[in-house]
Design a protein with these regions (language model features):
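Function-determining sites in protein domains
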Residues: 19-189
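Bacterial Sec-dependent N-terminal signal peptides
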Residues: 1-29
């Protein structure tokens, strides 16, 4: 009984001694918007091929298990989960895109100005570090005069990306609601 009384007293004391803090700001303080400065566009292009797949979460583990069964299975894994392509000249995977479950669409040039606002250098960053393995279900192939000049692999679930073929600073890609804007554009195609 005595032990119960002491335990209750300690809990009551701890509860009462917790400091409550008023978090509300005074009305005179206004939020200062983060100024974003834009730099160089990532790619100088005249065509974008958009590849997408509806790979289900449950099938991802299967990709890893099956990657050594055939060339198609290997590409399915390396394109969707891994680092393929490693360079802008590593284009063999493009021959397999439809075989590994991607659907190809052409992005109308009327969307290019909106896309340029996303694939551009930014000085401000409101990004975060993702703690998941990216599954690249959306891939953009940027071309100039029929030649591939840039590739962007996007994981909308993790907000991760892999962009190759540009010397622009891609570090702040994804800030300023880039993922939401890009997803909206791609869903409208």
């Amino acid at each position: 009984m005595y032990l119960k009384f002491i335990t209750l007293f300690v809990l009551f004391f701890l509860f009462c001694s917790c400091k409550k803090e008023n978090i509300s700001e005074s009305p005179s303080k206004e939020a200062i918007p983060l100024e974003i400065k834009y730099g160089k566009v990532f790619f100088d292009y005249d065509q974008i091929d958009y590849y997408s797949t509806n790979l289900e979460e449950g099938k991802i583990e299967e990709l890893d298990k099956n990657q050594n069964k055939s060339k198609v299975d290997k590409y399915k894994y390396t394109v969707t989960i891994d680092e393929t392509p490693e360079t802008i000249t590593d284009l063999a995977f493009l021959k397999y895109m439809e075989k590994i479950g991607f659907v190809k669409k052409k992005i109308d040039s009327s969307k290019f100005p909106e896309i340029n606002k996303i694939f551009i250098e930014k000085t401000a960053s409101d990004g975060y570090a993702a703690a998941c393995v990216p599954v690249f279900r959306d891939i953009l192939i940027f071309k100039k005069l029929g030649k591939v000049i840039g590739i962007a692999k996007i994981c909308f679930g993790c907000h991760q990306y892999r962009i190759i073929g540009t010397d622009a600073d891609t570090e702040n890609f994804g800030t300023n609601n880039d993922y939401e804007k890009l997803k909206y554009i791609l869903n409208s195609i």
